[in-house]
Each structure stands twice: as C-alpha cells, then as structure tokens.
Curated annotation (Swiss-Prot):
NCBIfam families: lipid_A_lpxD (TIGR01853), PRK00892.1 (NF002060). This is UDP-3-O-acylglucosamine N-acyltransferase. Pfam families: Hexapep, LpxD. It is an enzyme of class 2 (transferase). Homotrimer. It comes from Pseudomonas aeruginosa (strain ATCC 15692 / DSM 22644 / CIP 104116 / JCM 14847 / LMG 12228 / 1C / PRS 101 / PAO1). Belongs to the transferase hexapeptide repeat family. LpxD subfamily. PANTHER family: UDP-3-O-ACYLGLUCOSAMINE N-ACYLTRANSFERASE, UDP-3-O-ACYLGLUCOSAMINE N-ACYLTRANSFERASE 1, MITOCHONDRIAL-RELATED. InterPro entries: Hexapep, Hexapep_transf_CS, LpxD, Trimer_LpxA-like_sf, UDP_GlcNAc_AcTrfase_non-rep. Gene3D superfamilies: 1.20.5.170, Hexapeptide repeat proteins (2.160.10.10), MurE/MurF, N-terminal domain (3.40.1390.10).
C-alpha cells in the first residue's frame, strides 16, 4: 500500500521562498492541474490560456504570480515564477523508488571494475573490465556498463540502459530505459560499389546534469569523442550520430535526428522531429520549430522553420498541386516579363521620336 506524502503549505512555501496567502498549516498531499486538483492538492498557473480554470478550481492552494494572486479569492503561494516553483516542489512528491546501496547477487561485476560502496547495482546488470561507478550511482536491472566506462556521482540509470566501452558520463546524469550510448557510428568507405566499414575508435563524453530519454541513441566518435555538454536535456527516441557536439543547456524534443559531425551551440532548443544534415554548425540561442530540416549552418540567434503548417486536407492538396506547377508558372512569368519589357522598350522609343 502506498503511503501518503504530506507537507504543510508553510513548509512548501519555505522550500521555494513563496509568500503564503491563506492557512500556512493547510496539509498538501500532492500536485495536480487546475482542472483536476482537489482540496488536498497544490496546483499552479503558468500559462495564461489556463487562467479561465482558476476561479472554479478546487485546489487547496495555487502557485501564482503576485498579479494573478491579487484577484484570487482562494489560498495561494505567491512566487515570481510559478512553473519553476512547481518544478522544484515536484521532487518532494516524486515516488520513484530509491535503490539501496550494494550489488545484487545476480549482477556480474568484473574483478577490476570499481564500484563505490554507496552505489546500487541492480539485478542482472553487467559491469565490464575497468569500469568505474561513482558515489550514489543507481544502476537498474539488466543495464550493461562497457569496459573502461565511467559514471560520475549521483547518476541514475533506469533498467536496460546500455553503455558501450569508453563512455564517460559526468555527475547527476539520468538515463531512461532503452537508451544506448556509445554504439558504433555509421561510417563506411565505398570501394567500387561495396561498403567497407570504418572502425569507430572514439568514445562518448557526457557532461554533468544531463537527462537522456528512453530509446535515445548516441553514437561513439569515429576518431575523437562525441560530446554532450553540461545540462543538456534529450527527450525520447533521439538519434545523435558520431562526432556530434552539443553545447551546454541545449534541449531537444522527441525524434530529433542529428547527422554526423554537426555542432550545436549552447542554450538551443530543437522541437520534435527536427533533422540536421552533417558537418554544419548552429550558433548559441537558436530555436528550431518542429519538423524543420536544417540543411545549412545557422550563424545568427533566433527562430527557424521549414516545416509546412497544418491546414485542412483539401486546401493542402490544392497547395501541393500548385507547388508542382511552380516551374511552369515561373517560365510563363518570365515570358510575360520579356513581353512587357519589349512593349515598354518600344513605347519609350516612340516617345523619343
């Protein structure tokens, strides 16, 4: 049976530096949206489009800015950034199991591997020769940690994560199930129509405070390491090819695909389904909208798009038909321009006469 987590509103306020407007002793047992929250739950208003739900919300208390709290009759925690406060408080109510320190009897650990006594190694995990596991690391069941790979302190690997050999991971990195780090990059040389494999002799280096989603893959470098900077956040099912470099605090949504040797700057955001060709560079502070195909380097910060926005199917079919006619339309336009130029030239000559 699951025990109930409970905090007073005053305790939550102290955790995020909020001003309490209402009963500081009110018990809060969870978090929920404005529409779904009950009297024992805390909610938040971060997006103006949800403001319409605030007056009717049954939440015991709501995280609000000072401006929103002034017109609110209920109990509130007043903060500068409600969404950031919610993010901080969410960890207090996280029921993710915490593994006890130690190595499960079914795990296989190489004799020369180093596992900190405070680390946890789950059932049927494999830790190969020369690997080093830092303090407080949690390795889930059926994980594989390849030879000479390193996991920094406080790391968390869900079940079935695979690290190939020579992967270096910084502190406090979280990796979800199915992720594969350090697989061989897609490198081949063509000889008379036959593909000859290129050994991928680099590794992967990942910084601190990185999050890697389920079934995301990061290939090892062909020569030097594939590099993932500090604070990078990667969603599920992302493909990062060999020798890619990703700058600090860049975030990517699901199904992004990055071709080999691309370099992405710091504080960038790539929305779902974005694709990058290889050997290009993206500068810092770039936002790329969903389904965009980036085919050349981006040298100026800002927002970039190439995807086609949704429209009713009948309209889209008409637009697609027009696109197929563009070459013909361009030729006809050029002919009209030539005729117009000839008429204009003839008229000018007559005027001069």
């Amino acid at each position: 049976m699951m025990s109930t987590l409970s905090y007073t509103l005053g305790q939550l306020a102290a955790h995020v530096g909020a001003e309490v407007r209402g009963d500081a002793d009110l018990p809060i047992q969870g978090l929920a949206t404005l529409q779904e929250a009950g009297p024992a739950q805390l909610s938040f208003l971060a997006n103006p489009q949800y403001r319409k739900y605030l007056p009717e919300s049954r939440a015991g208390a709501v995280l609000l800015t000072a401006a929103d709290a002034d017109g609110f009759a209920g109990t509130a925690l007043v903060v500068a950034n409600p969404y950031l406060a919610y993010a901080s408080l969410s960890h207090l109510f996280d029921r993710k199991p915490k593994a006890a320190a130690g190595i499960h009897p079914t795990a296989i650990v190489a004799a020369d591997a180093e596992v900190d006594p405070s680390a946890s190694v789950g059932a049927y995990a494999v830790i190969e020769s020369g690997a080093r596991i830092g303090a407080g690391v949690s390795i889930g069941a059926h994980c594989v940690i390849g030879a000479r790979s390193v996991i920094g302190e406080g790391g968390w690997l869900a079940p079935r994560v695979t690290l190939y050999h020579d992967v270096t991971i910084g502190a406090r990195v979280s990796i979800q199930s199915g992720a594969v780090i350090g697989g061989e990059g897609f490198g081949f040389a063509n000889e008379k129509g036959v593909w000859q494999k290129i050994a991928q002799i680099g590794g992967v280096t990942i910084g601190d405070d990185v999050e890697i989603g389920a079934n995301t893959t990061i290939d090892r470098g062909a020569l030097s390491d594939t590099l993932i900077g500090n604070g990078v956040k990667l969603d599920n099912q992302i493909m990062i090819a060999h020798n890619v470099q990703i700058g600090d605090h860049t975030a990517m949504a699901a199904c992004v695909g990055i071709s080999g040797s691309a370099k992405i700057g710091r504080h960038c955001m790539l929305a779902g389904g974005v694709g990058l060709v290889g050997h290009i560079e993206i500068c810092d502070n770039v936002f790329v909208t969903g389904m965009t195909m980036v085919t050349r380097s981006i040298t100026e910060p800002g927002s970039y798009s190439s995807g086609t926005a949704m429209q009713p199917a009948a309209e889209w079919k008409k637009s697609a038909a027009r696109i197929r006619q563009l070459d013909d339309m361009a030729r006809r336009l050029q002919q009209l321009e030539k005729r117009l130029a000839a008429v204009t030239s003839s008229g000018d000559a007559s005027s001069d006469a």
